[in-house]
């Protein structure tokens, strides 16, 4: 029986659906896999070494998780543990990544709004986070290719702050400065909530 640890934020639907999809796959191929959820607080409080120690104690075959690019993920391989990174901040070059078509998501958003007749577009996201950057790139490039007279604006927070932290006053000022009517794409649901709360 394969033992797989998940180190991710299970308050997000993406992580729960990822776990569900892997469980369904294991069932569909007739595999008996033991799937264990680990909170990110283990990594954040005690470091990646604590995750590795826990994985060794649990005799884990693999760890799928959100890792910082400063985490020494090669330590997993040295201990015979397969490691797969879930999109978090940046992709890894040394281990496989679970990722999505983020550029395409941005493109689809821009195409949808353009078909609705919008001429002013804006993007709200987080800078230096792979999924936010690629969604903005797809959104912006599609807007610019559709019509050079379309306007585009972006507000992207720095990643130095926690992903959930935002400046309400800055967001309100930016929203008020946008030409109306405006089509706004947020990089994720949390950022969309920020807009509706502002």
Regions found by a protein language model. Give the residues of each.
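Bacterial carbohydrate/catabolite-sensing allosteric modules
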Residues: 1-62, 71-198
